[in-house]
Amino acid sequence: MNAVRQTTLGDCVTLSGVGVHSGKRARLSIAPAEADTGIVFHRLDSAQSVRACRGAVRGSDLATVLRDSNGPAVSTVEHLLACFAGLGVDNAHVEIDGPEVPILDGSADEFVAAVELLLAMNSDGSIFPGIMGLNAPQARALMPQGA
């Protein structure tokens, strides 16, 4: 078992919308992942994956694009990754049916609303107490309006 607690989701969630750059319908599902998995995007239309890490960034003009050396690209990942970072999600599988994450409301808010409800388990199976002892809804209530 790892000395550092790692967080994942307690269940799966599916979101859909439109890709802001492609204009195409996009659907993604976020699922729990084991400790040390990290955030991994799985392209369902190509059966390949890309890990969200600095080395996979292939562009950041208008949208962040991730791509492994010989895998598919996934773009417009920045709002979803901001959601994971803000809520402390270390490990998740993100299945996406095309090349672009849906834009939803144009921010991370809808991702946060969906993910924070499932942020209940650590990768080791223990209960997640939340950031600084607060659960996600409590921490969010302390944020300034409009943040």
Feature names for model-found ranges:
Residues M1-A147:
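Core subunits and conserved enzymes of cellular information-processing
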